[in-house]
């Protein structure tokens, strides 16, 4: 799966065509109030472009929450339609279903330039391919009904645009089942693919990956895929303790230790040696007597280790200095996973200092990519998203891409 050769919306002529766009409007709601509209704002450039290029109609489809294949009022996209209308400054027609004769007829006879938002795709089991039965167990959707669902979605457009990167790792009907001749990436997906291609297909070297997070076993595929591509690797966050204890027998007290992950540490280091990859680990720690915001704060280095009853929740200044030096040498930096428990202020300094270095690197012209999930939350928390080259919008999708997996939603797009 090449990331750099997919059709994008700019490659298409959408004039007088019905443009069917899979967006990600999975926004947090408090009742019917949207508490964060960022995902809607992110989709606006693609929607506006289709309208500027004189598309006949723009049909938007999305999921919201996990209604498990049935209609659940609190997951209706009706409040989202009002917000899209407000942001676009243009009327948005909300339809109470996403497939079926009524929807098909409405779209067929829509006014020129009309924007239509369909109801939640996941109200139908055919979107995800399964639903939950009364006993909470998965029930597979009927294959014929899935085919009909996909046919009905396909009938709503002349061209298909995917701008929902966060769902690209799911082989859902709206991601892979629309059978139109031209299927292209919207601006959001295009940017994701461009930046991940810069890292994974043709990085400017030296290439550094910063990998944090809790468990080695959760990140092992990621480490495995990247170790053959990078020049240096910083391993930080909770999973560093498994490396420190296994490799150097550092006393880690009650810090996180991943027994399963420990079995793979030797293998990782062997691969690093084989590919001539410099591996950087923390050397000092900010410690806590419990996993809590109000924990007592301590400090430990590799020499004395972390005492029993205490746990490392962040890295210390010496570690940050090592990270800084490694970041300074790199030209492409990919970061996935925080350096400490940034949710607690007393244990956020290591992550914040690493972020400051990453911002400085990006501002000096280096490519800095934040790989979604918690690290994207960190960038948002400190308001620096626009100071980095790219902050991915896909948690699971970016992780799978970095693990070397094909994303069904990307594979389904037409190639140039």
Swiss-Prot record:
Localization in the cell: Cytoplasm; Mitochondrion
Keyword Mitochondrion: yes
Gene Ontology molecular functions: ADP binding; ATP binding; metal ion binding; phosphoglycerate kinase activity
Keyword Magnesium in annotation: yes
Residues making up the signal peptide according to the UniProt record: none
Record-listed CDP binding positions: 213, 218, 237, 337, 339, 342
Top-rank EC class of the record's enzyme: transferase
Cofactors that this protein relies on: Mg(2+)
Residues engaged in binding (2R)-3-phosphoglycerate: 23-26, 38-39, 62-63, 65-66, 121-122, 169-170
EC number: 2.7.2.3
Alphabetized UniProt keyword annotations: ATP-binding, Cytoplasm, Glycolysis, Kinase, Magnesium, Metal-binding, Mitochondrion, Nucleotide-binding, Transferase
Annotated positions binding ADP: 213, 237, 342
Binding site for AMP: 214-215, 219, 238, 312, 343
GO cellular component: cytosol; mitochondrion
Gene3D superfamilies per record: Phosphoglycerate kinase, N-terminal domain
Record SUPFAM superfamilies: Phosphoglycerate kinase (SSF53748)
Reactions catalysed, as given in the entry: (2R)-3-phosphoglycerate + ATP = (2R)-3-phospho-glyceroyl phosphate + ADP
A GO BP entry: gluconeogenesis
Listed pathway(s): Carbohydrate degradation; glycolysis; pyruvate from D-glyceraldehyde 3-phosphate: step 2/5
Coiled-coil intervals, chain numbering: none
Subunit structure, interactors included: Monomer.
HAMAP family recorded: Phosphoglyc_kinase (MF_00145)
Family membership noted in the UniProt record: Belongs to the phosphoglycerate kinase family.
PANTHER family for this protein: PHOSPHOGLYCERATE KINASE (PTHR11406:SF0)
Function: Catalyzes one of the two ATP producing reactions in the glycolytic pathway via the reversible conversion of 1,3-diphosphoglycerate to 3-phosphoglycerate. Both L- and D- forms of purine and pyrimidine nucleotides can be used as substrates, but the activity is much lower on pyrimidines. Negatively regulates the biosynthesis of acetyl-CoA from pyruvate in the mitochondrion.
Protein name according to UniProt: Phosphoglycerate kinase
Organism: Funneliformis mosseae (Endomycorrhizal fungus)
Phylogenetic lineage: Eukaryota, Fungi, Fungi incertae sedis, Mucoromycota, Glomeromycotina
